[in-house]
Protein backbone atom coordinates (compact mmCIF):
# COMPACT_ATOMS: atom_id res chain seq x y z
CA UNK A 1 0.00 0.00 0.00
CA UNK A 2 0.97 3.67 0.12
CA UNK A 3 3.63 4.74 2.60
CA UNK A 4 2.28 6.09 5.89
CA UNK A 5 1.42 9.75 5.52
CA UNK A 6 3.99 12.09 6.99
CA UNK A 7 3.17 15.19 8.93
CA UNK A 8 -0.12 16.00 10.58
CA UNK A 9 -3.42 16.78 8.98
CA UNK A 10 -4.62 20.35 9.38
CA UNK A 11 -8.31 20.77 10.10
CA UNK A 12 -9.28 23.46 7.63
CA UNK A 13 -13.00 23.41 8.39
CA UNK A 14 -12.55 26.29 10.88
CA UNK A 15 -11.35 28.58 8.10
CA UNK A 16 -13.88 27.86 5.38
CA UNK A 17 -16.01 30.90 4.73
CA UNK A 18 -18.82 31.23 2.23
CA UNK A 19 -17.95 29.56 -1.04
CA UNK A 20 -14.35 28.59 -1.59
CA UNK A 21 -12.76 31.82 -0.41
CA UNK A 22 -10.86 31.78 2.85
CA UNK A 23 -10.11 35.12 4.48
CA UNK A 24 -7.06 34.89 6.72
CA UNK A 25 -5.82 37.13 9.52
CA UNK A 26 -2.38 38.67 9.10
CA UNK A 27 -1.00 36.46 11.79
CA UNK A 28 2.65 35.46 11.70
CA UNK A 29 2.76 31.89 13.01
CA UNK A 30 4.67 30.10 10.26
CA UNK A 31 4.21 26.42 9.61
CA UNK A 32 6.02 24.14 7.19
CA UNK A 33 4.00 21.95 4.85
CA UNK A 34 4.99 18.53 3.58
CA UNK A 35 5.57 20.26 0.23
CA UNK A 36 8.51 21.98 2.01
CA UNK A 37 6.93 25.40 1.66
CA UNK A 38 6.52 27.80 4.56
CA UNK A 39 3.03 29.22 5.09
CA UNK A 40 2.63 32.35 7.23
CA UNK A 41 -0.05 30.71 9.36
CA UNK A 42 -2.39 27.74 9.46
CA UNK A 43 -5.20 29.66 7.78
CA UNK A 44 -2.97 30.64 4.84
CA UNK A 45 -1.86 27.02 4.64
CA UNK A 46 -5.50 25.99 4.27
CA UNK A 47 -6.21 28.70 1.71
CA UNK A 48 -3.20 27.86 -0.45
CA UNK A 49 -3.33 24.07 -0.31
CA UNK A 50 -7.07 23.87 -0.90
CA UNK A 51 -6.77 23.23 -4.62
CA UNK A 52 -3.52 21.28 -4.72
CA UNK A 53 -3.65 18.05 -6.67
CA UNK A 54 -2.37 16.13 -3.67
CA UNK A 55 -2.82 16.39 0.05
CA UNK A 56 -0.39 18.67 1.82
CA UNK A 57 0.02 18.09 5.53
CA UNK A 58 1.79 20.00 8.26
CA UNK A 59 5.41 18.94 8.68
CA UNK A 60 6.35 21.22 11.56
CA UNK A 61 5.14 24.24 13.53
CA UNK A 62 7.98 26.43 12.33
CA UNK A 63 9.26 27.71 9.00
CA UNK A 64 10.82 25.01 6.82
CA UNK A 65 14.53 24.28 7.19
CA UNK A 66 14.77 23.83 3.45
CA UNK A 67 12.44 26.07 1.50
CA UNK A 68 11.14 24.65 -1.78
CA UNK A 69 9.30 27.69 -3.08
CA UNK A 70 11.82 28.86 -5.64
CA UNK A 71 13.93 26.32 -7.45
CA UNK A 72 14.35 25.33 -11.06
CA UNK A 73 13.75 22.05 -12.86
CA UNK A 74 17.32 22.19 -14.11
CA UNK A 75 19.71 21.92 -11.19
CA UNK A 76 23.29 23.11 -10.95
CA UNK A 77 26.06 20.73 -10.02
CA UNK A 78 27.05 22.34 -6.72
CA UNK A 79 27.40 19.82 -3.94
CA UNK A 80 25.65 20.68 -0.67
CA UNK A 81 24.23 17.31 0.24
CA UNK A 82 20.87 16.80 1.91
CA UNK A 83 19.61 13.50 3.21
CA UNK A 84 16.06 12.64 2.23
CA UNK A 85 13.67 10.57 4.32
CA UNK A 86 13.91 7.99 1.53
CA UNK A 87 17.54 7.38 2.53
CA UNK A 88 18.94 8.98 -0.62
CA UNK A 89 21.56 11.70 -0.77
CA UNK A 90 20.50 14.72 -2.81
CA UNK A 91 23.42 16.75 -4.08
CA UNK A 92 21.78 20.10 -3.35
CA UNK A 93 18.57 21.88 -2.42
CA UNK A 94 17.39 22.04 -6.02
CA UNK A 95 17.57 18.30 -6.60
CA UNK A 96 16.01 17.68 -3.18
CA UNK A 97 13.10 20.03 -3.93
CA UNK A 98 12.47 18.37 -7.28
CA UNK A 99 12.34 15.00 -5.53
CA UNK A 100 9.88 16.37 -2.95
CA UNK A 101 7.70 17.67 -5.76
CA UNK A 102 7.80 14.38 -7.66
CA UNK A 103 7.05 12.43 -4.50
CA UNK A 104 3.99 14.63 -3.90
CA UNK A 105 5.20 15.48 -0.45
CA UNK A 106 6.09 11.98 0.74
CA UNK A 107 9.82 12.74 0.93
CA UNK A 108 11.00 15.17 3.58
CA UNK A 109 14.37 16.32 4.88
CA UNK A 110 15.90 13.77 7.22
CA UNK A 111 19.04 15.78 7.86
CA UNK A 112 21.52 18.26 6.46
CA UNK A 113 24.57 16.55 5.01
CA UNK A 114 24.92 13.01 3.74
CA UNK A 115 22.75 10.19 5.01
Curated annotation (Swiss-Prot):
Note: Three very similar inhibitors found in the submandibular glands are secreted into the saliva. The sequence shown is one of the two main inhibitors.
Known function: This inhibitor is composed of two homologous actively inhibiting halves: one which inhibits trypsin, the other which inhibits elastase.
Disulfide pattern: 12-46, 24-43, 32-64, 68-97, 75-94, 83-115
Site annotation Reactive bond 2 for elastase: residues: 77-78
Ranges of residues in domain Kazal-like: 6-66, 67-115
Compartments reported by the entry: Secreted
InterPro entries according to UniProt: Bifunctional_prot_inhibitor (IPR051597), Kazal_dom (IPR002350), Kazal_dom_sf (IPR036058), Prot_inh_Kazal-m (IPR001239)
Name assigned to this protein: Double-headed protease inhibitor, submandibular gland
One Gene Ontology cellular component annotation held by this UniProt entry: extracellular region
Chain positions of site Reactive bond 1 for trypsin: 26-27
Pfam family, one: Kazal_1
SMART domains: KAZAL
Predominant location category: secreted
Keywords, alphabetical: Disulfide bond, Protease inhibitor, Repeat, Secreted, Serine protease inhibitor
Gene Ontology terms, MF aspect: serine-type endopeptidase inhibitor activity
Amino acid sequence: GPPPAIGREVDCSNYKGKGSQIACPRLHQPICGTDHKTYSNECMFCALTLNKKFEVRKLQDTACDIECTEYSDMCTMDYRPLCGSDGKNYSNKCSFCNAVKKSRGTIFLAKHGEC
